[in-house]
């Protein structure tokens, strides 16, 4: 997700708060972001359990990832335009409440159709959150504190959820079952909701985003190169990674405890990858994105051959986790390097694209894994990553960090 330097233009000045209140408000949004993104990716780690419990295939269970992505892709631009002059404080707390309700529905769902209703609601919450989160980070920053620092705290919640949500979900599912895992995630949202109600200041806009603002990034040639690369690499990742747990169970024969440990290793490596990207991509985003694509492609290419043994699986899942941990930062910094003035206006459609990638990747990955198997899926993912690598190498050859995306 993009990370801004400053508050979105057109937002009114914040009301006076103590520095402590401001930091607590930022923390409440960060923890909310962690819970929200964890909820989105949680099914990846529990697909086997859900499929077995409800008597469905792993591919069909993958709709738990696909549907929220579709709804979030629709909600991001629609809400960003439709909320108009509404106080963003009420929007954010309302979206947190929707997340709590959605996870509770999943936890107590009597069948798969009811479960999917909860996941659709979650998608609305995800899309709405990202339609406003960037502007919120700028508004909440204490005086004298760089907006990028405040934003980085919120984005750390997102990054940790992206790379740790799956392994933590798998671990909790092994301890107490997948239903209780979703219920725990819902309960985490309750103190977050209360904190937001009492700590967030009024966030009235002076000027809302207009429909004509949305395609800002798509009209910039070098931004389009980045968007194409993000599309190809992201599709490959979400198509393949969504079904890593079934691969480990069916092809490698690992038990649930081993799978959980491997996914935790992925998450730990992802945190390191995120830190690496913060340094490397701010120096050369093109070279860093090329390296990320190379690492993901290497992982997916070697997975069918070497990930059936514990040593090979550990090495490849760690490499994959490190690479994807760096991927969101690379995507964000690319946009700031090539189109710094367009990121704010183009953010809702950027969010929509990312959610479409998640939805399409998990959907087509499910179809392929059900019909053709995991090895074919991983081979196709490798080809997509290769296409993304070539896009950056050839079409992005003129991209350089002459404009610093984010001050250190």
Task: Outline where the language-model segments fall.
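C-terminal transmembrane helical hairpin of 12-TM major facilitator-type secondary transporters
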Residues: 287-331
């Amino acid at each position: 997700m993009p990370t801004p330097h400053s508050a979105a233009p057109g937002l009114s000045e914040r009301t006076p708060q103590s520095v402590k209140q401001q930091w607590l408000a930022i923390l409440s949004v960060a923890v909310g972001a962690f819970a929200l993104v964890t909820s989105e990716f949680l099914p990846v780690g529990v697909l086997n359990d859900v499929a077995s419990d409800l008597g469905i295939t792993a591919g069909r269970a993958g709709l738990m990832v696909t549907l929220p992505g579709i709804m979030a892709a629709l909600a991001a631009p629609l809400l960003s335009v439709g909320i108009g002059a509404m106080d963003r404080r009420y929007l954010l707390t309302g979206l947190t409440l929707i997340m709590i309700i959605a996870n509770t529905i999943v936890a107590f769902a009597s069948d798969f159709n009811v479960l999917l209703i909860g996941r659709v609601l979650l998608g609305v919450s995800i899309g709405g959150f990202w339609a406003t989160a960037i502007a919120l980070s700028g508004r909440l920053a204490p005086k004298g504190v760089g907006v990028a620092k405040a934003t980085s705290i919120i984005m750390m919640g997102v990054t940790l959820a992206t790379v740790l949500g799956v392994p933590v979900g798998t671990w909790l599912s092994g301890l107490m079952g997948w239903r209780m895992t979703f219920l725990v995630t819902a309960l985490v949202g309750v103190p977050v909701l209360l904190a937001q109600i009492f700590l967030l200041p009024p966030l009235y806009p002076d000027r809302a985003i207009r429909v004509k603002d949305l395609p800002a990034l798509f009209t910039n040639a070098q931004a389009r190169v980045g968007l194409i690369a993000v599309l190809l690499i992201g599709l490959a990742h979400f198509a393949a990674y969504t079904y890593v747990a079934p691969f480990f169970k069916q092809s490698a024969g690992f038990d649930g405890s081993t799978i959980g440990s491997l996914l935790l290793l992925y998450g730990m490596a992802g945190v390191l990858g995120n830190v690496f990207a913060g340094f490397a991509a701010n120096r050369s985003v093109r070279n860093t994105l090329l390296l990320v694509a190379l690492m993901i492609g290497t992982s997916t290419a070697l997975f069918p051959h070497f990930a059936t043994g514990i040593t090979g699986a550990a090495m490849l899942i760690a490499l994959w986790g490190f690479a994807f941990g760096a991927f969101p930062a690379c995507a964000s910094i690319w946009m700031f390097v090539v189109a710094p003035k367009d990121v704010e206006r183009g953010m809702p459609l950027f969010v929509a694209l990312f959610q479409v990638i998640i939805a399409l990747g998990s959907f087509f990955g499910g179809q392929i894994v059900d019909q053709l198997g995991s090895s074919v899926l991983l081979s196709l993912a490798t080809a997509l990553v290769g296409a993304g690598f070539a896009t950056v190498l050839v079409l992005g050859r003129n991209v350089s960090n002459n404009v610093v995306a984010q001050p250190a």
